[in-house]
Amino acid sequence: MDRPDLAATAAELLHGLGVPEERSSGGDLRITTPLTGEVIAEVPQSTADDVDDAVGAAAEAFRRWSSVPGPRRGEVVRAFGQRLREHKEQLADLVTLEAGKIASESLGEVQEMIDMCDLAVGLSRQVGGHTLPSERPGHRLMETWHPLGPVGVITAFNFPVAVWAWNAAVALVCGDPLVWKPSEKTPLTALACASLLQNVAEEAGHDLPLAQVVIGDRDVGVALVEHEGLPLVSATGSTRMGADVGPRVAARFGRSLLELGGNNAAIVTPSADLELTRRAVVFAAVGTAGQRCTSLRRLIVHEDVADQTVELLASAYDRLAIGNPWRDDEVLVGPLIDGRAYEGMQAALARATDEGASVVTGGGRHDAGEPDAYYVEPAIVESPEQSPLVCEETFAPILYVLRYRELDEAIALHNAVPQGLSSAIYPPDLRAAERFLGPHGSDCGIANVNTGPSGAEIGGAFGGEKATGGGREAGSD
């Protein structure tokens, strides 16, 4: 079978999505696909001066866009959502090429963008304020919400388009243009989204730079977060990144919305439905090759059902379809993003055994016929205790299994990590579920019952507590 020319495919997709050739070729930043490890594009990088120019253009656009009535801004977002529907498969293919996701996940990510546009269109007629009684006779208090200004958005490689849309759709209906720094590993999808939005805006009579893209490494990110022309910066990434971004924005009295790492756990009670648990746990742990901020990383299992649970999971792991999703639609687990991610996984597994844990299954490199890519066998690791390693987030498909005797002990283990994004419990009864969902249960921003912790649903506020940053997106916030 002839190998497809993925660089040519990427160029064709970008052209079809309206990206100017000068933005996606002829540059010095080499974009490799995790599917094969080959270069699929060479894009120009931005400089600090480019960031300054982009923020200046966004400020000028803000003066005009914020004067457009909210419902009319909502019409532009509605049209953008429709354009995404028209190009859903093309954009999803680009997500798969650039981020290595399987087709269903890529299509689901674009659908999240569409759903977010639908939510924001409704909000465009509801953004208002409050009228309150005053203690002074003949007066009333009015709280009125006004557009904030240009918004900076920093996104990660694992959700290269959806997280931007969570921010962009709401910012746009509120009157705020955006300056977007995608991960330098996945800038092509950003260029495509910005191009689609720009075309929609121009067709509606708004020749304004509503979503500019700046591409580059940490220096570009620093220039963005330190720019005083951005009253708000929304940043998605690691806890380490957030610890750098937050103080930089605060130093200039800006606002930051941080969506950072997770070390998500699920509790399996002694009378849980183990077949339901198996299905939920497997995808939560191995989906996106364990590269979601909501991926399941710790499984806290009652000692009475621990052996049976591990046996069921190990059997399922041994049957996982791992490989190149571009060539095989049946694949469930695609590649890690790059060699650095693979090295991090191997280092974590070596450290786990040094700390007394045992690898039940997986952990090795998988032969997918792509020697320059990094496919791995998802690992299950039994740990006698919640060691320092288990308290860290390793962005790879490693599931640590811990045992407990009493529910209070399980919840204590669950909460005894720095991060607090998503969580789950598998109980047959409401009492355990309510205990977990209550104020003395999970300390995460998201709690699930009888389903996995991975994923998000538009309309419900997404975000976490503690070292996850405290930000909320895509919902009632």
Q: What residue ranges belong to the model's regions?
A:
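N-terminal Rossmann-like NAD(P)+-binding subdomain of aldehyde/semialdehyde dehydrogenases
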Residues: 1-139
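Terminal low-complexity tails and localization/encapsulation signals of metabolic enzymes
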Residues: 1-43, 75, 79, 129-155, ...
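Conserved C-terminal structural/oligomerization subdomain of aldehyde/semialdehyde dehydrogenase
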Residues: 36-41, 205, 267, 368-477
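Residue-level signal for inorganic ion chemistry
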Residues: 37, 73, 95, 117, ...
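Short, well-ordered beta-strand elements within core beta-sheets of diverse protein domains
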Residues: 39-46, 61-67, 153, 266-269, ...
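Structural signal for hydrophobic packing residues in well-ordered secondary-structure cores
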Residues: 62, 66, 81-88, 92, ...
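Rossmann-like NAD(P) dinucleotide-binding subdomain of oxidoreductase/dehydrogenase enzymes
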Residues: 129-276, 330, 404
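ALDH superfamily catalytic-core signature
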Residues: 199, 240-385, 412, 449
